[in-house]
Design a protein with these regions (language model features):
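Interface-prone segments of viral and bacterial extracellular assemblies
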Residues: 1-242
C-alpha cells in the first residue's frame, strides 16, 4: 500500500510526486490540516422585527387612484409604511376596523415604503392650464433615513409621464433628477408639480421642511372603501413581521 507524501513543482513547470510505501498496520498519515464540520446558516424567524414608523396615510385623488392602483379607481385610502428597525423589519399585516373593536385582515405589505420628510421648503407654484407644471426654479430636499430609502434619477420623459411620482404633504410631485447628498438624503430637481389633480395643494401654501414625503410605487398599501363609509372613522393596526 502506498500513499502520497508530497508534491513538488519544478521551475520548468514539471512536477515531482513522492509516494511512500506503508508496511504493517501503518496505512495512513495524519493530515497536515484538519477539517471542521459545517453547520450551515439557520435563520431565527422569531427575532422581534420591532414596530413601525408613523405611517403616512392619505386619500388619493380620483385621478391618482384610477391610474396608479390595481383597484381601478374608486374611493381609497393609501398608506406608506416602514419599520423602525430597517434591518429586521420585513413588512406587516394590515387590519382595519370601523368600530374600533372588531378588526378584519385588509392585506399584507412586504418591504418598506420609501418614505421620510422634506428638508427644504417647497414654495407655491402657479398652475399652467396649457400643460404640465414643470418647475425648473425650485428643488426639494428629502430625508428617507427612517426607511433607509433610496431614489434613482430618471429622464425628463419619466418626470412628465409621472413615473417618479411622490406624495409631498397633499401634492403629487414627480422629478427628473435625484442628487444623493448624504445617507438616504437627496435633492430633487426638474419637478413636475400639482399632478393628478393636486393643483390646489400646489397653489395653496408653501410646504415647510418636515413635510411628510413618500415615493409612490408598489410599496404603498391601498385600501378601498365604498361611499357608505364616507365620513366614518377607520382604525388601522399594523402587525410587523421579520
Amino acid at each position: 500500500r502506498v500513499v502520497l507524501s508530497s508534491l513538488e513543482r519544478n521551475a520548468d513547470g514539471g512536477q515531482w510526486i513522492h509516494w511512500q510505501r506503508c508496511f504493517g498496520s501503518q496505512t495512513t498519515i495524519a493530515p497536515r490540516y484538519g477539517t471542521q464540520a459545517t453547520s450551515g446558516y439557520t435563520p431565527n424567524t422569531n427575532v422581534d422585527p420591532g414596530g413601525i414608523n408613523e405611517p403616512i396615510i392619505f386619500e388619493p385623488t380620483d385621478q391618482l387612484g384610477a391610474v396608479n392602483s390595481p383597484l381601478g379607481g374608486g374611493l381609497q385610502v393609501w398608506a406608506a409604511i416602514s419599520g423602525v428597525n430597517t434591518t429586521l423589519w420585513g413588512g406587516c399585516n394590515v387590519y382595519g376596523s370601523y368600530d374600533g373593536v372588531t378588526y378584519s385582515h385588509l392585506g399584507r405589505v412586504v418591504g418598506p415604503a420609501r418614505m421620510g420628510v422634506t428638508t427644504t421648503e417647497l414654495p407655491v407654484f402657479s398652475d399652467n392650464p396649457a400643460g404640465p407644471n414643470v418647475d425648473n426654479v425650485n428643488s426639494l430636499g428629502v430625508n428617507l433615513s427612517v426607511s433607509a430609502g433610496a431614489l434613482l434619477s430618471g429622464t425628463a420623459e419619466d418626470a412628465l409621464a409621472l413615473n417618479t411620482a411622490c406624495y409631498v404633504g397633499g401634492e403629487i410631485v414627480a422629478y427628473r433628477d435625484a442628487l444623493l447628498t448624504g445617507a438616504s438624503t437627496y435633492t430633487l430637481s426638474y419637478l413636475v408639480r400639482g399632478a393628478y389633480g393636486t393643483e390646489d395643494s400646489m397653489e395653496a401654501a408653501p410646504k415647510p421642511a418636515g413635510t411628510p414625503f413618500a415615493r409612490l410605487d408598489q410599496g404603498i398599501f391601498k385600501m378601498p372603501f365604498d361611499k357608505t363609509r364616507i365620513g366614518a372613522t377607520v382604525s388601522l393596526k399594523f402587525q410587523s413581521f421579520n
